[in-house]
Each structure stands twice: as structure tokens, then as C-alpha cells.
Amino acid sequence: QRCTSTRRLIIHESIYDKVKDALVAAYKQLRIGNPLDENNHVGPLIDTHAVEMYAAALNKVVAEGGKILVEGGVLSGQGYESGCYVKPAIAEAENSFEIVQHETFAPVLYLIKYSGEVENAIEIQNGVAQGLSSAIMTNNLREAERFLSATGSDCGIANVNIGTSGAEIGGAFGGEKETGGGRESGSDAWKI
């Protein structure tokens, strides 16, 4: 539900299956429950409307031709009475899918395969209306520099070898394109 959560993973075809298999295995180990219990990884969504949006996203990705790899769903029973606990889902998708272009604040991860050079991944990454946070995982310094360059990631936050979530304390925080309304914190907070 964080605005900086990873929702699209753009993976090179040479490692796609390996990454996909590792993610599917990891998701099967997630514990869902009371967020105050340190043994749990995932808490509830904010309200039942968020649950409806989550369910609609899963239905939409399938309707558009995507493939569910880790089945989602709403949990019920003891400890889940609120109706707001859902299973994190993974779906294979295309960046052109309408649902992938839409920001869903729920645990749905879209896997998108790319081929060729890192520029192709950057083009896919930049091919949405949102632009808050991005990250690249690479051992190649040139790819990292390309991602961080003026013609690379068009997000307000661009990270290398760390996730998309989080922000630097005291650093400017904000996005590009349809994301956010300017910068919060940092030196931008003093500007009028």
C-alpha cells in the first residue's frame, strides 16, 4: 500500500525464469496476519474498498491476457474478520496492459520480460503515467549510470541495487509526471 512499493518487475529474458521461480517460492512462504506480530510479513489492506480494487486488478490482468503465478484471494476465518487480509499475488503481464498502467495500492506484482539492452527495460519502466520511485538491480556500472542519467529513469527517486521503497530522511521526496505535487522535505521544502 506504500506509494513507493514495487509493482512492476522488468526482468531480462536471460534470467527471467530463475527470478520468477525464486519469487514464486518466496511468496509461498509469506505469513499474513496481524502486523503487530513480528512473525508476520503482510498485514491487512486499509479498507474493503482497497480489497475490491485488489480483486479487480487480478481479474483485469487475467482478462487482458496475463497469467497468475501466485494466486491471490481474500482470507477469512479467525484473525481475518475484517475482510481486509489478502494474499500477495504475482502475475505475468505486458506493460501495455491497462491494469499495469494503473496504480493499484495492493500486493500485486507484475512480472514483465524484456530482451536486448538495458535501454529497452528503461523504456518499459518509463512507459507509465506515474513516476515516483524506481530501482535497477545490476552488476554493470554502465547500466547503473545509464539508468541514473538524464535520459534514464524518469522517476523522482531512482535507486541502484536497493528496492523502490523508502526515502532518505531529510531528502527531497516526490515524483515526476502524474505523481505527487512537488517535493516534500529537503532543500525543496524551503522553496516558494
Region locations from a protein language model:
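NAD(P)-dependent aldehyde/semialdehyde dehydrogenase
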Residues: 13-130
